[in-house]
């Protein structure tokens, strides 16, 4: 392909509540066996982008561990590959990434050494499938300076975590409002995916750095919306961000829908992830599992309904789990009741416990001793 990829995966996110205390949002487990960043990296690979940089910063240990081998996404190649860039102290720079534009600026040498004419920039915290070639073709057809992938959202959508765009009949963006406070009827939002010519990106980023501007949306898209040809490419398939705890919960629950599972996992192209060699889930006598997604390595002795169990979860005798997400390596003691919850990974839920999210999603973080002698 004629483009390189950049995945923005470094920001902290307090809207994820306790879930972001241990990992970056891009490393959040999704759909039983995947991580948030797997969907963007798979899209890059399936679009034949052979050189991809992941820009990390906040709580990056789990994400770096997940990306320790590039072979899972077919980036293990002599030409190109997968690059992990964290902020480093140099003679010219002594700070962390101060924003999305600054994260690109601090890795500008990689952009300058590349020879591909275009750059695809995407966030690592969205779940979707996309052929970036189609976006690039649209970008060239419109003779755009920047193309923003957008999605039409129905009335009632919480747009406070998105950028809302307004376009003319030809698709050119006329206005861009980042994370508006006011409610909207049906509107068009930015998906945080951009296509731009590499040389122009270098020029824009260098200008931002000279003026001490650090944010890609505010200091490039909004600032130049009337000066540059910025176009919207509409994505009509499934797309959802996992940038809040509530959105993360709903996105995972969407995978209990058979049509969505078929779209992601039984329809070409595939979604790739790091593979752990674990045994299949074991259902002991007394297990009752209904409309749930259970990952490998789990042992089930109780009732699981409308829930997702990630890898190596143990469910004790007489347990009931409803409408919940249990992350990796959680031990749930006997006679426990869990409903409308997200249970943090590597936790131990003591026997006879009860956790219910009554006014919303409850996040359970229990690090009890697993074995008492």
Give residue spans per PLM region:
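Left-handed beta-helix
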Residues: 1-4, 199, 207-373
């Amino acid at each position: 392909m004629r483009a390189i990829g950049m995945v923005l995966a470094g920001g902290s996110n307090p809207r994820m509540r306790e879930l972001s205390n241990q990992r970056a949002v891009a490393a959040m487990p999704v759909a039983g066996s995947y991580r948030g960043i797997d969907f963007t990296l798979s899209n890059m690979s399936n679009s034949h982008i052979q050189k991809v940089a992941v820009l990390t910063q906040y709580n990056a240990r789990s994400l770096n561990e997940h990306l320790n081998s590039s072979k899972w996404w077919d980036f293990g190649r002599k030409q190109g590959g997968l690059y992990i860039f964290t902020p480093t102290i140099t003679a010219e720079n002594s700070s962390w990434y101060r924003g999305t534009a600054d994260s690109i600026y601090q890795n500008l040498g990689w952009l300058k050494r590349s020879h591909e004419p275009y750059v695809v920039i995407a966030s690592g915290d969205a779940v979707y499938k996309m052929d970036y070639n189609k976006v690039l073709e649209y970008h060239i057809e419109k003779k755009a300076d920047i193309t923003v992938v957008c999605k039409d959202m129905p009335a009632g959508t919480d747009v406070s975590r998105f950028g809302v765009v307004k376009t003319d009949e030809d698709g050119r963006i006329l206005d861009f409002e980042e994370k508006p406070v006011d409610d909207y009827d049906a509107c068009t939002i930015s998906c945080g995916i951009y296509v731009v010519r590499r040389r122009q990106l270098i020029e824009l980023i260098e200008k931002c750095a000279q003026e001490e501007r650090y944010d890609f949306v505010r200091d490039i898209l909004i600032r130049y919306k009337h000066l540059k040809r910025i176009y919207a490419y509409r994505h009509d398939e499934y797309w959802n961000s996992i940038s809040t705890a509530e959105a993360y919960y709903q996105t995972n629950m969407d995978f209990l829908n058979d049509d969505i599972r078929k779209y992601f996992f039984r329809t070409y192209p595939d979604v790739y992830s790091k593979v752990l060699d674990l045994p299949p889930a074991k259902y002991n006598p007394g297990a009752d599992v209904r409309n749930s997604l259970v990952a490998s390595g789990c042992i089930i002795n109780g009732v699981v309904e409308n829930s997702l169990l990630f890898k190596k979860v143990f469910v004790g005798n007489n347990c009931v789990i409803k409408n919940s997400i249990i992350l990796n390596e959680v031990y749930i003691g006997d006679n426990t009741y869990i409903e409308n919850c997200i249970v943090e990974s590597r936790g131990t839920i003591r026997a006879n416990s009860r956790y219910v999210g009554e006014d919303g999603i409850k996040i359970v973080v229990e690090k009890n001793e697993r074995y008492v002698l």
